[in-house]
Amino acid sequence: SAAGISLAHIEAGLSSFTPVQGRSRAIGAVWQGRPITLVDDSYNANPDSVRAAIDLLRELPAPHVLVLGDMGEVGEQGASFHEEVGQYAASQGIEHLLTLGALARYSAARHSAAQHAGDRAQDWPQAWDMLQGLLPHAGSVLVKGSRFMGMERIVQAMLHAADGTQERMAPCC
């Protein structure tokens, strides 16, 4: 027991835990008969949380696709912060970066400059169309962006179009 609570009770509580939507929620999806891990981290983004998300994505099955919307509240350093996370994604072996937003284009440019695939969508329907072209080859997809970008629309479109889904307790599983 721990703190007077039985381990069985703790295990039961942890096994019923469901992460909050948009906060590193891992979902096992089937796309055209292939398993894909989708991580919905669409609720918010800043340079530190994007780097942490990239670290998480790197641990999941490859090939990796990072769908990144603009990070908000970055002030005058917005372009450089976005370049930095694009470079970090490339340095961590993220094979494909798909961006959405005026500032996220700097992430795609830096990722592409490091000899990795980086694409920039003009709007979320175009981002979804581009992502559909990547999904047949993806092992894991992580969606991240600041709240105002509405990146959850990409997650919802993917879940709606998937052959099937299953919530996972943690992204590591």
List each language-model region with its residue ranges.
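ATP-dependent carboxylate-amine ligase
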Residues: 1-173
